[in-house]
Each structure stands twice: as structure tokens, then as C-alpha cells.
């Protein structure tokens, strides 16, 4: 099990979670952040600092955002396991359902 970032993060990208993550497993996509499921150690440090409450334990993701569990896995299909977001930097792409969403927060 791991933590998942869901739709409230889209077009917000606050990044407070990145600063809290002790293992650097939160990667920046084009429109939202993604938690690497193999690099996350399930510490939960990211969850309480998210100002839009977009981070959930995998088993607790609300049904309306269930697709984001798969999105957090799919984002890393091309990227693999680079061993830390800092060495990768921003990855200017997103996966479904994020890539097909209209701009959020407007």
C-alpha cells in the first residue's frame, strides 16, 4: 500500500508535501504531483501538510477519485524508478484522468 495524490492537486501544485517527504518520492508532473508507489515508505508525512487535502492512503481514496490510484502508477510507466524526484525535476506530462481535465480553479 502507498499514498495517492488525487484531483484536488490538479493545477494547484502547492508542493508542501514535497518538502515533508523524507524519501523524495513525490514527483512533479505538468499539472499535478504524483507519489511513486514503489519509493513511498508509507510514513504519511505528506498527508497532513497538503492544503487542499488531495493526499490519501491508498485504501482511503474517495470513490469519486479512485482513478487517481491507477494514475499515480501509470505516471511512472515511462519514468521507471529513478530513485528520487530531485534528480529528475519536473516531468512536463500527465496521465489520464489528469490530461483530459479542463483547467481547474478558474
From Swiss-Prot:
Cofactor detail note: Binds 1 [4Fe-4S] cluster.
InterPro entries, per database record: 4Fe4S_Fe-S-bd, 4Fe4S_Fe_S_CS, 7Fe_ferredoxin, FdxA_Actino, RnfB_subfamily
Domain (4Fe-4S ferredoxin-type) ranges: 31-60
Keyword vocabulary terms for this entry: 3Fe-4S, 4Fe-4S, Electron transport, Iron, Iron-sulfur, Metal-binding, Repeat, Transport
Binding site for [4Fe-4S] cluster: 21, 40, 43, 46
Domain of life: Bacteria
Pfam families registered for this protein in UniProt: Fer4 (PF00037)
Gene3D superfamilies noted in UniProt: 3.30.70.20
Binding site for [3Fe-4S] cluster: 9, 17, 50
UniProt keyword Repeat, yes or no: yes
Record's protein name: Ferredoxin
Main function: Ferredoxins are iron-sulfur proteins that transfer electrons in a wide variety of metabolic reactions.
Coiled-coil region list: none
Cofactor: [4Fe-4S] cluster; [3Fe-4S] cluster
Region (Disordered), start-end ranges: 84-106
Keyword set includes rRNA-binding: no
GO molecular function, one term: electron transfer activity
Amino acid at each position: 500500500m502507498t499514498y495517492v495524490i488525487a484531483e484536488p492537486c490538479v493545477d494547484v501544485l502547492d508542493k508542501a508535501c514535497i518538502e515533508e517527504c523524507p524519501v523524495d518520492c513525490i514527483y512533479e508532473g505538468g499539472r499535478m504531483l504524483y507519489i511513486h508507489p514503489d519509493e513511498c515508505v508509507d510514513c504519511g508525512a505528506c498527508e497532513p501538510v497538503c492544503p487542499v487535502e488531495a493526499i490519501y492512503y491508498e485504501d482511503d481514496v474517495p470513490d469519486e477519485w479512485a482513478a487517481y490510484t491507477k494514475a499515480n502508477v501509470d505516471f511512472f510507466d515511462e519514468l521507471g524508478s529513478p530513485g528520487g524526484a530531485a534528480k529528475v525535476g519536473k516531468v512536463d506530462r500527465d496521465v489520464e484522468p489528469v490530461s483530459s481535465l479542463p483547467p481547474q480553479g478558474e
